Design a protein with these regions (language model features):
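Long, charged, low-complexity intrinsically disordered regions
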Residues: 33-56, 63
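Nucleotide-binding motor/catalytic cores of P-loop/tubulin-like NTPases across gene-expression machines
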Residues: 98-104, 119-124
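Conserved mixed alpha/beta catalytic, RNA-binding, or beta-rich assembly cores of soluble enzyme
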Residues: 55-83, 87
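Short basic, glycine-rich beta-strand/loop surfaces that mediate nucleic-acid
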Residues: 109-159
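Charge-patterned, long linear interaction tracts outside catalytic cores
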Residues: 166-178
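N-terminal cysteine/histidine-rich coordination modules
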Residues: 1-43
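Local sequence-structure signature of Cys/Sec-based thiol-disulfide redox active-site neighborhoods
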Residues: 88-95
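Short helix-coil boundary/hinge micro-motifs
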Residues: 86, 102-111
Length: 178
């Protein structure tokens, strides 16, 4: 079982998000020896393991986005974003217009910007097919913004895998907002 959220007990095994490294770890049962008592009977397929981890990381990112939205800290859509100046962060979809993005950034001046998130993932959080922009609002009441830090970490994990398929994430997996 992959500990994507980092909450399971024990030492576990860590493998970098590189399919070649995963293949090497799986070769000869090296990974199975560290993860299972029944190493001789356990067959691990590197491609399946990597795709499964990528999917789980993608789900975790969608869940973080949904949680921010439910907390009222994720503003979706360009028109709504423009009404909330000085966001902590700006999320730009992979199909967003470069001209509109530059205009939005110059007007809002967010602290950080994440480019290239799938438009379908952002849209699903908003109960739409796709969405070009979302902004993260600061939590003024908290000295440390744990939810935003978690989102940034989840985006970094998702980028490391690069093969995630966010379009397969839907309400049946529990990542749908509201």
């Amino acid at each position: 079982m992959a500990d994507i959220a980092g909450k399971l007990p024990g030492r576990g095994a860590w493998v970098t998000a590189d399919i070649e490294i995963v293949r090497k770890a799986v070769t000869g049962g090296k990974l199975a020896r560290h993860l299972s008592k029944d190493a001789g009977r356990t067959q691990v397929n590197a491609e399946f393991l990597f795709e499964n981890l990528a999917f789980q990381v993608s789900r975790q990112l969608a869940a973080s986005l949904s949680m921010l939205r439910r907390a009222g800290r994720l503003v979706l859509g360009r028109m709504t974003i423009e009404q909330n100046p000085h966001p902590a962060g700006l999320l730009v979809a992979d199909d967003a217009s470069q001209r509109e993005t530059a205009s939005l950034i110059s007007r809002l001046q967010p602290d950080w910007i994440e480019y290239g998130l799938p438009a379908q993932m952002l849209g699903r959080v908003a109960s739409r097919v796709s969405l070009a922009y979302a902004s993260v609002i600061r939590d003024a009441a908290a000295p440390e913004d744990v939810m935003t830090d978690r989102l940034v970490a989840d985006i970094a994990y998702w980028r490391a895998f690069g093969t995630a398929q966010p379009d397969k994430i839907g309400p049946e997996e529990g990542c749908h907002a509201d």
